[in-house]
Amino acid sequence: FEENGTWQGAGLLSERSKIRVRVVSRNANDRFDKAFWARRVEWAWQHRVTTMGTLALPGCEPDTTCCRVIFSEADGFPGLVVDRYEQVLVAQVGTVGMGRLRPLIYPLLLQTLRADGQDVRAVYERNDSPSRAKEGLPLEKGWWDAAGAPDSARLVVRENGLSFDLDLENSQK
């Protein structure tokens, strides 16, 4: 709310960050429940498919097997970036709010992409950015849920016909 009582929006609180609130919605009727986040995930994915066409659908475009799925504030997920490499989603969480929502959002991501015919099997977290300390978050990396995860954190991905050896654990996110 503004000082005069005008509604401005609702967001995720971070008591340790210099950015105390990250706005998620300016709609006073929104509730940050599972249905809300499911709509956000679906919107972000459909936005990728609409704007990128088959490039957003690894496997449909033989020259590209990776894409960005969630781009933080641009998609309404403050502090969350998710990229797809082959059958793995690689997530980086940079805010307390998104950290708390991981158990809700990751399954929604897998469910949404699978419902669209995408072969995604696991989520690998790269939460090792030093900026997490400003939020009071620990540095960590690894499989979010090992069920469905490949035996190795190394993949070969293609982008525009070029192949790249990708080390999910140690390469730059």
Predicted regions and their residues:
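Residue-level recognition of conserved beta-strand edge/terminus positions
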Residues: 1-2, 92, 126
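Non-catalytic accessory regions of SAM-dependent methyltransferases
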Residues: 1-86
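Short, glycine-/Ser/Thr-/acidic-enriched flexible segments
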Residues: 4-7, 96, 171
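Hydrophobic residues embedded in beta-strands of well-ordered beta-sheets
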Residues: 7, 89, 163-164
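Short histidine-centered catalytic/ligand-binding loop motif
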Residues: 23-31, 90-102
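Short, well-ordered alpha-helical segments
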Residues: 35, 39, 99, 103-107
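Non-catalytic substrate-recognition/targeting regions of SAM-dependent transferases
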Residues: 72-77, 81-83, 102-172
